[in-house]
Design a protein with these regions (language model features):
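Low-complexity, Ser/Thr/Pro/Gly-enriched N-terminal "stalk/linker" regions
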Residues: 21-67
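Non-membrane alpha-helical segments in proteins
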Residues: 81-95, 107-111, 141-152
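Long, well-ordered core segments of solenoidal/helical folds
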Residues: 47-58, 105-123, 164-186, 219-239, ...
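Active-site lining segments of carbohydrate-active enzymes
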Residues: 128-246, 254-257, 369-376
Length: 601
């Protein structure tokens, strides 16, 4: 905590950035002189698809669906697309500078200002939004930031249309965000998870661009600083994000975004050694990179593809002096052809295009263009606080930890295997969010259950949720991790110990050993393995999975194959394709003490 306080006292010193000189405005020669022409044309073309397009209202009947049916995606699709429309038009106008997009932007701003609430029904307590209920959450803060950035970048042109519109923007952001944020002791201000920095990064933008009362501005900055300190203090020293790589983008990356806005850190800032935790938090994202465009997808990951948005990843690596991060971001940009397809990356940079982050990124575009690209493929990673090990080859990741993590799945001791950077044994991830996802019924969802991870079903019991259900690290050395996962199961499972060892061996093999002792025998023990590749039971002792083989002792184990494809929703089908399978290997013996070994080749 002392280090966090000292760090933020340094990072928040130069509050002269309130002068709002962070980004050149519309008409500044920077946008035509510094941004490559091909990138500018990409942004312009992206915006042109929205010229003369109607601004849809968001139907209250669709908003109410969440409370009535549990569906949250119907409203999200409509809301996110409307924000995308504005973000695309603003960037196009900024790049072209001919006022061609301004009428649509002004109409879009007015349409959003007329919305009752800027957030999602999943985060609202009644079935329809009320004008007087403006609690600050993720997406109304993010909408506010989009409007605030638009106001700043295009202030002269908006004022040219009508100074009253500038006043209306300030009034709405004050009413919806600035006043309730400063007056209310929201739970997320002290949280050690993504809501804290995600909201703070957007709150900070609203303060910088729309707060004109210096007393309130000073208090808001103080509160944002305090919230950042709370977030950093709660983070482990190893920088691991227990919410998974998917949420890193709105956890550690949003912390950096907040600090960047409040201080506008210069490239000559000397942040070491006080930023060791921030550096560790930053590096987590490439430490979880597998290769071939895949990333480790523990916790609530809506995909297993690499999740680095270069518009925040590159500035993060630049400011912290992390060459690996910078080169990773440039490599992603090269793979995605950012010079010609900049708008495609911009479009994918959030639930809708992240205007603020794109503006941050473009300040450093010339440095980016002269950077060497390099795909990060670390041989081994060990995060002792999060209890995650990765090793290669083949690529293996295994996690310990506990079952009370943010966006938790009951997955203590689970592993994934990606030979040559391709999925073989996988974590299914998470499907579409519904009203169940963050409710008491969360663990009714199959993707949250240990029986649908690469884990044992012991004595008839699955793992339990809660921080008390955890692993103990027994041994770690490069390429090998032994965990006692007995603590992740309820006492009724009658486990003395269950030692799981995952070892990467020469010849591109992974060996898994299960050494266990039970107090009593109640039901057959089973080993579960999840794979998108159809398993074939060709002969006793081997299971063929495409070009790979799972070898086991047929005197110990009886395998069966279950097609779990019917469980997949649209999100999971997009991740894994048309099929997903579960291998169940049932132990033949009822002995209380056993050792079982199987190998992936």
């Amino acid at each position: 905590m002392k280090r966090a306080l000292l760090l933020t006292s340094i990072l928040f010193t130069a509050l002269s950035v309130w002068a709002v000189k962070l980004f050149p405005k519309w008409g500044d020669t920077f946008w035509c002189d510094s941004i490559p022409e091909t990138m500018r044309q990409s942004y312009i073309a992206f915006g042109e698809q929205y010229l003369k397009k109607e601004w849809n209202c968001l139907p209250v009947s669709v908003f109410a669906e969440y409370k009535k049916t549990g569906n949250r995606t119907h409203y999200e699709v409509l809301m996110f697309e409307k924000r995308r429309q504005l973000a695309a038009l603003v960037m196009a106008e900024l790049m072209e500078g001919q006022r061609r997009f301004m009428p649509d932007i002004i109409n879009g701003l007015m349409s959003m200002l007329e919305e009752t609430w800027w957030g999602l029904p999943a985060h609202y307590k009644t079935e329809i939004p009320r004008t007087e209920d403006q609690n600050v959450d993720l997406f109304n803060a993010e909408t506010a930031a989009l409007v605030a950035y638009t106001r700043h970048i295009l202030s002269d042109e908006i004022g040219r249309f009508s100074p009253l519109l500038l006043q209306r923007i300030d009034q709405e952001i004050s009413r919806r965000i600035l006043l309730p944020a400063i007056k209310t002791n929201y739970w997320w201000k002290t949280a050690g998870m993504n809501w804290n920095p995600w909201i703070c990064s957007n709150w900070a933008a609203c303060v910088l661009f729309c707060e004109h009362d210096e007393t309130r501005k000073t208090e808001a900055i103080r509160q944002i600083r305090q919230a950042c300190e709370s977030f950093m203090a709660a983070y482990p020293a190893d920088g691991g994000c227990d919410e998974g790589p998917h949420y890193w983008d709105r956890a550690a990356a949003s912390l950096f975004e907040t600090l960047y806005l409040l201080q506008n850190i210069s490239l000559t800032s000397h942040l070491s050694p006080l930023t060791s935790k921030i550096r560790a938090m930053e590096s987590y994202i490439y430490k979880m990179y597998i290769g071939n465009g895949y990333a480790v997808n523990f916790a609530d990951a809506h995909g297993n593809r690499a999740m680095l948005n270069i518009n925040i990843g590159y500035p993060f690596g630049l400011i912290t002096g992390d060459e690996t991060m910078r080169q990773y971001a440039v490599w992603v940009g090269q793979q995605e052809d950012v010079l010609h397809q900049a708008a495609l990356l911009y479009n994918k940079s959030g639930n809708w295009p992240s205007l603020g982050r794109e503006l941050i990124f473009l300040q450093h575009i010339q440095t980016f263009l002269h950077e060497k690209p390099q795909e990060p493929q670390l041989n081994e990673v060990w995060l002792p606080d999060l209890q995650i090990m990765t090793a290669r080859e083949p690529f293996v990741a295994i996690k310990g930890g506990h079952n009370g993590e943010s966006h938790n799945h009951n997955d203590v001791g689970s592993f994934i295997v990606y030979p040559d950077g391709k999925p073989l044994f996988i974590d299914p991830g998470v499907g579409e969010y519904t009203s169940k996802t963050f409710s008491r019924q969360r663990y009714d969802i199959w993707t949250m259950q240990s029986d649908y991870h690469n884990l044992p079903h012991i004595n008839g019991y699955s793992q339990k949720d809660g921080k008390a259900f955890k692993a103990r690290v027994v041994t770690h050395k490069p390429g090998l991790l032994t965990l006692d996962i007995s603590g992740a199961y309820p006492a009724e499972a009658q486990i003395k110990h269950w030692l799981r060892t995952v070892r990467v061996k020469k010849g591109k093999q992974v060996e898994i050993t299960e050494d266990f002792a039970l107090q009593s025998y109640q039901a057959p023990n089973q080993l579960m393995l999840i794979t998108p590749i159809k398993p074939e039971l060709n002969k006793a002792g081997t299971i063929t999975l495409g070009n790979h083989t799972l070898c086991y002792d047929f005197n110990q184990l009886t395998p069966e194959i279950e097609d779990i494809t019917p469980l997949l929703d649209a999100v999971l089908q997009q991740m894994w394709g048309s099929h997903l399978y579960r291998i169940k290997m049932t132990l033949r013996s009822s002995n209380l003490k056993q050792s079982v070994r199987y190998t992936i080749r």
